Amino acid sequence: MILADGFSSGKSDPDALWNGLENGEYPFISKLREAGFDLVLLGFEERSASIIDNADVAIECIEKVIADREGSAKLTVGGFSMGGLVTRYALAKMHHDGGDHQTATFLSYDTPHSGAWLPISVQAFAHFVKDNWGTLPGFGELLSSFSRMINSAAAKQLLRWHIESVSAQAQQHRARTDFLKELKRVGSWPPGVRRLGVANGTGTGAGNNIPARVTAMRTTGTELTGTRLDTQDTGEQIVAILKKTGSPEIPITTNGLPDIDGAPGGLFPEAPNLPGRPANFGTAAMLAGLLEGEPAELTYNATTFVPSVSAVAAAEVDDRDALYSKIDPADSELDHFMCASENQGHTVMTEELGRWIVDKLQTP
């Protein structure tokens, strides 16, 4: 069994990946071993690199596992978050190009098959901070890091709505549409392979109770006086006011997006090694606190990152009705899927989802 790491910046940390799978709520790796599976964890030199580039690494891994295995057992191949898209594309490309991936089952864990979400207000604030303080001695690198992650090759391919700069309009990036065309060119899915998937969000239509059009983060100091970031709503909306003291305020406007922050889905992952474990709005608050020397007002740390309909490939995330409806198995492009009983952190290994995977892998 091969499972690929997901999106982040920098090199994969195999110890952290292992720890999250084995030493949390459910000892997933031990349970796989008890069921007779060998597990290969696939990492990447740069997790924010292009999905297509990292798929080349996945293909090398699949070929090596086939060459090194004992016997002729078929493989299970998949991944967490972006890792599911990397391996999905890798398997489809291998088949399209005449290769033999010898894979019986594909598995994705909270993978954004239909796209991921990062609030436009948060994206704009990250770019605003980089533009104004990115060269600050001692802090510029840290203050610019969130913006650089948002503008990485993988983020442009994953996010359903993306902005490259404060002044840009929210839309699918060209890198995403190009990737989707390439995925379609190689067949979209590997034929003849059973598709399994799990979502860290609910499948009942029950959201996370985060309301639309409310302020999630507000600054309290003197450097960013008047800056606020709001949750997303439908229709035309000012989702953020960005203000550097002494300069004109910059309103950030969106139009035609769904109220997606509160939708059923896996929540934006928290950073466990940073104070307060910041997530999406939480990271914006952390950056504001660094600039102002006092904490920002944070109402919501994490909102939806991978909607459930995306994780189980059941609908597009710009379909507001689908976002908040019970998921019909007939709508999914997966053969079998499991949604969490409550909305939880993106790619968190739970007993509910882990046990379902282990059971399904033992069922033809």
Listing of model-derived features with the role each one plays in the protein:
Residues 1, 7, 34-40, 70-75, ...:
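Loop/turn elements at helix/coil->beta-strand transitions in domains of secreted/extracellular proteins
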Residues 1-41:
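Short, surface-exposed "cap/lid" segments of acyl-processing enzymes
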Residues 13, 19-21, 30-35, 56, ...:
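Extracellular, luminal, or virion-exposed ectodomains of exported proteins
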Residues 215-364:
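Terminal low-complexity/disordered tails
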